[in-house]
């Protein structure tokens, strides 16, 4: 019981983060604008929804209006114009959200910088990555083929935006900033405009994605922390194999009920979860929980998660959002891969004196394949090829210089190879490279008003070899994390995928 209390004890550091004055500083909006511009260079294609109307004149006008407190009284009858935002509500609201998202990330960035500065002294650092849409428990690199069942979970969303604000108040103790956040959410957005998807899953609206990903992930971060607690307390190999799923979140009053339940009969409560082969992955609005256990165990997990999340996290959840699938009979599109477990037959001949025996063995093998058809569909949607995979030119890039055209195609090709480097079969990737190479050649030929054959004869095929063979240092999508606890320090094999923007080439569903 003392171990549980130590785990749930909040960290008293980083309690005073006075961020509200920063919302009136011009450089904050400039830094937020430049930060988004630099990060957009890492995605596969240019972001068509990026707002390039930033100027210091607009920032000065916005800050002046925010200083005038009377203008915070906004008439809700006029949805397009009001005294505070003036005539361009969409532009101002986007600037405020970008600036606020940059500000609320400052405490976590400072914690990361402080930890990195002391890393040379062999201090294990911890940091938050609350804009990522991924979080992983040891999964793909582990011996996944020995697992039996998978829970496919559609992560629910909070029933009210106020819950997002309450989640942040455990980390940011600046009441003024939280009041501004609450005012901003309730005046300019509602839950329907925040979540814009007609499918069973959901996605965020294209505007202000950085802001809402931060809020939503801080909320999901809290829900996922229950896996940390249960996994650490129940695993037979808890001290060496798995470590913690996430850094713990201190949900105070909500967790007190959980402590009371465990205090009554701790061992009886946790017997359902004693499974050393439990894996968790979150990808956008989905997550999976894989286990070596039986169907009965997974069914108990299912109903436990539904009841726990509904009671303690105010989630709009029902059992229809969780499906139990047998791993050997189902393949799934997850994290951009087509993953499946197949039986790999092998035959062993045994010779014993004059008798020989043939022994058939079926070995499970975990395959991660590149989904060719959806990926070609994404390329076709971006006008690199037809729906049948025939390369075509990219007319909108014809006005660029030759080097810029080659650089754009090369960056897309390298990023695709980098993202799908974990595939067990690379044949599909070489076909994608062929499509991009020929599309690049046809774009260059269109620019110079010639055929592809004539263009290659005049310029030489070496022109395109560079973007096919050159190695560029690409920012790694995964990086190791380290966690610490109040009763010791340990290194855990946890990876977070630093992906906060998904375009059509990766998000084909």
UniProtKB/Swiss-Prot annotation:
Entry keywords, A to Z: Chloroplast, mRNA processing, Plastid, RNA-binding, tRNA processing
Entry annotated with the keyword Heme: no
Main location (coarse class): plastid
Location in the cell: Plastid, Chloroplast
GO CC terms in record: chloroplast
Pfam families in alphabetical order: Intron_maturas2, MatK_N
GO biological process assignments: mRNA processing; RNA splicing; tRNA processing
InterPro entries: Domain_X, Maturase_MatK, Maturase_MatK_N
Keyword Protein transport: no
GO molecular function ontology, one term from the record: RNA binding
Function per UniProt: Usually encoded in the trnK tRNA gene intron. Probably assists in splicing its own and other chloroplast group II introns.
Family in the record: Belongs to the intron maturase 2 family. MatK subfamily.
Name used for this protein in its record: Maturase K
């Amino acid at each position: 019981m003392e171990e549980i209390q130590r785990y749930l004890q909040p960290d008293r550091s980083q309690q005073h983060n006075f961020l509200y004055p920063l919302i009136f500083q011009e450089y904050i909006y400039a830094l937020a604008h430049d930060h988004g511009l630099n990060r957009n260079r890492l995605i596969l294609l240019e972001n068509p929804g990026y707002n390039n109307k930033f100027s210091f004149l607009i920032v000065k006008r916005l800050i002046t209006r925010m200083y005038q407190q009377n203008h915070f009284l906004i008439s809700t009858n006029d949805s397009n114009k009001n005294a505070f935002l003036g005539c361009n509500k969409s532009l101002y609201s986007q600037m405020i959200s970008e600036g606020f998202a940059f500000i609320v990330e400052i405490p976590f960035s400072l914690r990361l910088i402080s930890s990195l500065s002391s890393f040379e002294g062999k201090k294990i650092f911890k940091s938050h990555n609350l804009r990522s849409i991924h979080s992983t428990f040891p999964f793909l690199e582990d011996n996944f083929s020995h697992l039996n069942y998978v829970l496919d979970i559609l992560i629910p969303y909070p029933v009210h935006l106020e819950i997002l604000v309450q989640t942040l108040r455990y980390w940011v103790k600046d009441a003024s900033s939280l009041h501004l956040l609450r005012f901003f959410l309730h005046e300019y957005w509602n839950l329907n405009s925040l979540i814009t998807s007609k499918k069973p899953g959901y996605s965020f609206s294209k505007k202000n994605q950085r802001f809402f990903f931060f809020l939503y992930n801080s909320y999901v971060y809290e829900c996922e922390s229950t896996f940390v607690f249960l996994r650490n307390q129940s695993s037979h190999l808890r001290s060496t194999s798995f470590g913690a799923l996430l850094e713990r979140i201190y949900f105070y009053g909500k967790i007190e009920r959980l402590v009371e339940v465990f205090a009554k009969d701790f061992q009886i409560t946790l017997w359902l979860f004693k499974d050393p082969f439990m894996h968790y992955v979150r990808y956008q609005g989905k997550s999976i929980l894989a286990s070596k256990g039986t169907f009965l165990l997974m069914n108990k997990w299912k109903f436990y998660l539904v009841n726990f999340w509904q009671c303690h996290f105010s989630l709009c959840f029902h059992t229809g959002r969780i499906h139990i699938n047998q791993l050997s009979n189902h393949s799934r599109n997850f994290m951009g891969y087509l993953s499946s477990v197949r039986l790999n037959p092998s035959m062993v001949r045994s010779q014993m004196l004059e008798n020989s025996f043939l022994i058939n063995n079926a070995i499970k093998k975990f395959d991660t394949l590149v989904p060719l058809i959806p990926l070609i569909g994404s390329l076709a949607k971006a006008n690199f090829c037809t729906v049948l995979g025939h390369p075509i030119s990219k007319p909108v890039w014809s006005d660029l210089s030759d080097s810029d055209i080659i650089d754009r195609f090369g960056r897309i090709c390298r990023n695709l190879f980098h993202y799908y480097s974990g595939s067990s079969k690379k044949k599909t990737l070489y076909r994608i490279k062929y499509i991009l190479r020929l599309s690049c050649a046809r774009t260059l030929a269109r620019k110079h008003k010639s055929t592809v054959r004539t263009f290659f004869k005049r310029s030489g095929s070496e022109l395109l070899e560079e973007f096919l063979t050159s190695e560029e240092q690409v920012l790694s999508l995964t990086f190791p994390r380290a966690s610490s606890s109040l009763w010791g320090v340990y290194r855990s094999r946890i990876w977070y995928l630093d992906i906060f923007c998904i375009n059509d080439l990766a998000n084909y569903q």
